[in-house]
Regions:
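Conserved active-site-proximal phosphate/metal-binding subdomains
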Residues: 2-16, 22-150
């Protein structure tokens, strides 16, 4: 959030703060620094309405597993942050040999599906930001009210 005030002063468009915002306190801080809104994506991954798989939810809630995230292109061909697993570790987070979007997701589909039937998330895309501390098994409405400080 250190750059947020400078960005707000430098542009003439509304700024949406994102990255690590997982509590009402952080939402309030971003708004007080000039953000027009906040984006709190990871906080919603364990909400009742989310289609996040059980393997993904387990990884998000496991502090040992979730401690390691990386920006990777191996699942989609485009960079996105996810929990580090076997595929990211062995191929590397950003791999020149990863197929371009949207072909990369097709390349791992069979491997991912087989591993998941065996209870393994080694080849699954488990998208997540660096701060999963706000994730909880609640409704999206409850999460929104919590983040709003209501």
């Amino acid at each position: 959030m250190a750059l947020l005030p400078q960005i707000v002063q430098s542009v003439d468009k509304p700024v949406i703060a994102a990255g690590g915002i997982a509590s009402a306190k952080l939402v309030k801080a971003a708004l007080s620094l000039g953000a027009a809104a906040t984006q709190c994506g990871t906080s919603y991954l364990c909400c009742d309405e989310a289609t996040t798989s059980d393997l993904h939810r387990t990884a998000i809630k496991d502090p040992q597993q979730h401690r390691h995230t990386a920006v990777t292109n191996v699942f989609t061909g485009r960079p996105a942050r996810g929990i580090v697993n076997r595929l990211i570790s062995e191929i590397g987070p950003i791999a020149a040999q990863a197929p371009a979007f949207p072909l990369a997701s097709l390349a791992v589909t069979t491997l991912r599906a087989k591993a998941e039937t065996q209870g393994s998330s080694d080849f699954s895309s488990m998208w997540s930001g660096q701060n999963a501390s706000g994730c909880d098994d609640v409704s999206a409405e409850t999460m929104t009210l919590r983040l709003a400080g209501v």
